[in-house]
Every structure is written in C-alpha cells, then in structure tokens.
Amino acid sequence: MPFVDTSTLPVIERPPGWHRRYFHSTHVTFAHYDFKRGSSIHEHFHSQEEVYEVIEGELEVIIDGVAQIARAGLVAIVPGNVRHSVKALSDGRAIIVDHPLRPDFG
C-alpha cells in the first residue's frame, strides 16, 4: 500500500460533527477529519500516542487538563494513556495520526 487516495475512502461521522476518512499502515492509523464548529470529542484516553495536525480552522485541545488552541502551524501531541478532549472552535479540517495503529477504529 505505497499510495492511498483518501478521496475514495468511506466517510464516517463519529462523533456528530466530525466526518472522517481513515486508513491504517503497518504501524500507524491516519484519520482525515472535517469538523463543524461547536462539535467535540469527549474526554478519553487510549494507549496510542496521537498527533493532531490542523489544516484549516481551530481546535481547543485539552491534554491532561491543560487547554491549548491548535491551528495551522501548531501541532498537538497527546502521549499515550493521557486524558484528552477536543472542541471545534470553527469549521475546519485536521489530520490525526495514532501510533501504534488503532485496531478499534472503525
């Protein structure tokens, strides 16, 4: 799988306001999201390290109780097993990468 055309991947809305297309490589899960202002991802944690790369718009990312605004040029890195949540402050797009891959994604 050296190339993936993400435009051909099915779109899944989960949670409401977050539309994702995702795929796995051997060791990593990649998720391309379109998000709507006001939508959120509840506080949670998982064993994977997670990286949020905002392409357009702004997200409030809370990592272990500390809030920061993620926007183009500012990447949020969530260590594994650390509680985090996300709120969309605007409409936008982001790429979220998990390592190792998330077999539960789907």
Residue ranges of model-derived segments:
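A short, N-terminal "cap"/entry segment at the start of jelly-roll beta-barrel domains
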Residues: M1-H27, I77
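Conserved short histidine dyad/triad with adjacent acidic residue
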Residues: P15-P16, T29-H46
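A cytosolic small-molecule/anion-sensing beta-strand core signal
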Residues: I55-E56, R71-A72, S90
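Structural motif
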Residues: T29, V51, E58-E60, A67, ...
